[in-house]
């Protein structure tokens, strides 16, 4: 390709493509970044989030490279917004928990012990917890003196001239 054709090709290719090929200092690229920074800080009425230029992931709002943490780290960008992480290794978390446990009074159960389970109430075999009741449609809600109330409601619909039956069940404690 001669120089004139190369220049025409470069002008016809969007600046984002050139920036990925290493032309991040191109004036159009800088202008695009400045415009994006104004959109982020200003007030287009969206959610305010910025997408990563490479993969579309959520980018940090203060990232000057407009990239997600993974892209900034993998491309070696010096980015102050992605330096600090909230993730703490498990060993450090355990050390911190042990330090807090020695400072605070021992109100928790020792490790490995659990709260004892409550015993079930054994009901006599003669009592029945299942009650079948036919609820008339016009009477409203039926009141029963049992632990559980099971309701079964049948619904009949007319759809395209055919009756369709549906059943709804509910259990109330």
Curated annotation (Swiss-Prot):
Record localization: Nucleus
GO cellular component: nucleus
Keyword terms: Activator, Auxin biosynthesis, Auxin signaling pathway, Developmental protein, DNA-binding, Metal-binding, Nucleus, Zinc
Chain segments carrying region Disordered: 100-121
Binding site for Zn(2+) 1: 52, 63, 68
GO terms under biological process: auxin biosynthetic process; auxin-activated signaling pathway
InterPro entries with a match to the protein in the record: SHI, Znf_LRP1
Source species, domain of life: Eukaryota
Metal-binding found in the keyword field: yes
Biased composition (Low complexity): 100-110
Chief subcellular location: nucleus
Chain sites annotated for binding Zn(2+) 2: 52, 68, 72, 79
DNA-binding region(s) from the entry: 52-79
Function statement: Transcription activator that binds DNA on 5'-ACTCTAC-3' and promotes auxin homeostasis-regulating gene expression (e.g. YUC genes), as well as genes affecting stamen development, cell expansion and timing of flowering. Synergistically with other SHI-related proteins, regulates gynoecium, stamen and leaf development in a dose-dependent manner, controlling apical-basal patterning. Promotes style and stigma formation, and influence vascular development during gynoecium development. May also have a role in the formation and/or maintenance of the shoot apical meristem (SAM).
Family, similarity comment: Belongs to the SHI protein family.
Matches recorded under NCBIfam families: put_zinc_LRP1
Annotated protein name in UniProt: Protein SHI RELATED SEQUENCE 8
Organism: Arabidopsis thaliana
């Amino acid at each position: 390709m001669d120089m004139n054709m190369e220049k025409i090709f470069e002008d016809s290719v969007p600046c984002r493509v050139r920036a990925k090929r290493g032309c991040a200092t191109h004036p159009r690229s800088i202008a695009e970044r400045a415009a994006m920074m104004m959109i982020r800080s200003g007030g287009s009425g969206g959610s305010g989030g910025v997408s990563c230029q490479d993969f579309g992931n959520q980018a940090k709002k203060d990232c000057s490279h407009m990239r997600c943490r993974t892209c900034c780290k993998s491309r070696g960008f010096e980015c102050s917004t992605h330096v600090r992480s909230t993730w703490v290794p498990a060993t450090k978390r355990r050390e911190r928990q042990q330090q807090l446990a020695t400072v605070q009074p021992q109100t928790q159960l020792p490790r490995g012990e659990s709260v004892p389970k409550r015993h079930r109430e054994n009901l006599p075999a003669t009592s029945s917890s299942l009650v079948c009741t036919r609820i008339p449609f016009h009477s409203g809600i039926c009141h029963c003196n049992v632990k559980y109330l099971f309701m079964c409601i049948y619904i009949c619909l007319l759809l395209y001239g055919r009756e369709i039956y549906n059943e709804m069940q509910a259990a109330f404690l």
